From Swiss-Prot:
Involved in the synthesis of the GDP-mannose and dolichol-phosphate-mannose required for a number of critical mannosyl transfer reactions. Coiled coil: none annotated. One of its GO terms (cellular component) is cytosol. This is Phosphomannomutase 2. Its EC number is 5.4.2.8.
Amino acid sequence: MAAPGPALCLFDVDGTLTAPRQKITKDMDCFLQKLRQKIKIGVVGGSDFEKVQEQLGDDVIKKYDYVFPENGLVAYRDGKLLCKQNIQGHLGEALIQDLINYCLSYIAKIKLPKKRGTFIEFRNGMLNVSPIGRSCSQEERIEFYELDQKENIRQKFVEDLRKEFAGKGLTFSIGGQISFDVFPDGWDKRYCLGHVEKDGYKTIYFFGDKTMPGGNDHEIFTDPRTVGYTVAAPEDTRRICEELFC
């Protein structure tokens, strides 16, 4: 059972509310709206706002009390924009260009079954780096993910970057199936907690699938301000929520 007092449920998106990069099912959407009648709900993801809308609906800011794209660097509360940070102002153009150039050079040397386009996506609060390219098809995405599980393509890439850019104040975080994020230290999903902790919640529950060390849910999952739950699929998320709140 849930702890007494005002509480908030924060959900990761991919692998938690939806299948990776897929739209939320009607059943899951309806369940969350019923859950919202009992507890405040919010979403926090690494993707930009447009991708969150693609997965959770154009009216996402009306369906959730909090919406935190890009780890909360872009923040909505009660349907209104709270703030928007940007990575270039924090890191400076020189470091960003060094990082982009190095990543492109590394990707050029990787031999994969397939490569597509959009290898680096520049977002407000991070760079998203994809060895296969974000424009790959769903079938190609799955093919890369299965290969990555065997050969640790992203993990090796990240380890190389950590050595090359040591001391530069950068965090490298693997999430989803085909990419990893690069952002300033402290700009992981914990960033969104700064927006909600002043709203008086006694308990902040967090649900995510990439909660292991190196995963992009790990920091917020282990943060003392949250009660974390690891899930493997949206069905897990629903089951745990039903046990806690229904």
